[in-house]
């Protein structure tokens, strides 16, 4: 588990928050891989976006991919011609957001895949052990709303008037960020 033991790392409420969304070849961290990433770097107290990142990642084990997952994310080898290696994406993120707190809709998925990828590439953790899960904030907000029958990104966006193009990480993460801003800031 990543931990900041260095006393020079920023205090919790001063750390940058990296809103992050991955698309995967499936949801099993032991068999599947990250193939697309979008991230928004924000800084407290108002969580202004100071930088962003987007990349397609070269899949190396398509034989173990879940075909349904590939359909959902729109995987097409022609669209991945400019994809970068996993290691490069990890280095890019670590340079973009050192000492950050990860945030996302259900950010535990990204957390699990990110830890596995960093370990596989023998790279250090660049993020804190704390997570900001926007789904949990939405749950607290909508828990008594009789119109919210299923709490997911699409329904939450509709309820809050946020636009989203599902399973496109750049759209998903911007929508997640907008939901966060509307519920917290």
Residue spans for each PLM region:
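Active-site flanking residues adjacent to catalytic metal/cofactor-binding acidic residues
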Residues: 20, 132, 171
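Substrate-recognition/cap helix-loop segment adjacent to the acidic, metal-dependent catalytic center
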Residues: 108-130
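Conserved non-catalytic scaffold segment of RNase H-like nuclease domains
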Residues: 2-112, 153, 158-159, 167
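A polyampholytic, Gly/Pro-enriched intrinsically disordered region
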Residues: 144-162
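Short alpha-helix plus adjacent loop in nuclease-associated cores
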Residues: 131-148
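Acidic, divalent-metal-coordinating active-site segment for phosphoryl/phosphodiester hydrolysis
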Residues: 168-181
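Short, surface-exposed acidic
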Residues: 77-79, 124-129, 163-170
């Amino acid at each position: 588990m990543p931990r900041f033991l260095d006393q020079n790392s920023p205090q919790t409420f001063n750390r940058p928050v990296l809103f992050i969304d991955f698309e995967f070849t499936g949801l099993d961290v032991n068999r599947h891989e990250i193939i697309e990433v979008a991230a928004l770097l924000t800084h407290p107290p108002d969580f202004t976006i100071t930088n962003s990142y987007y990349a397609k990642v070269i899949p190396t084990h398509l034989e173990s991919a879940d075909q349904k997952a590939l359909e959902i994310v729109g995987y097409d080898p022609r669209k991945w011609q400019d994809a970068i290696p996993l290691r490069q994406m990890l280095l890019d993120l670590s340079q973009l957001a050192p000492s950050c707190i990860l945030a996302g809709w259900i950010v535990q998925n990204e957390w699990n895949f990110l830890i596995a990828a960093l370990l596989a590439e023998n790279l250090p953790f660049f993020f804190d052990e704390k997570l900001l899960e926007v789904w949990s904030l939405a749950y607290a907000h909508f828990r008594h709303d009789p119109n919210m029958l299923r709490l997911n990104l699409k329904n939450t966006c509709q309820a809050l008037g946020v636009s989203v193009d599902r399973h496109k990480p750049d759209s998903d993460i911007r929508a997640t960020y907008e939901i966060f801003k509307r519920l917290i800031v």
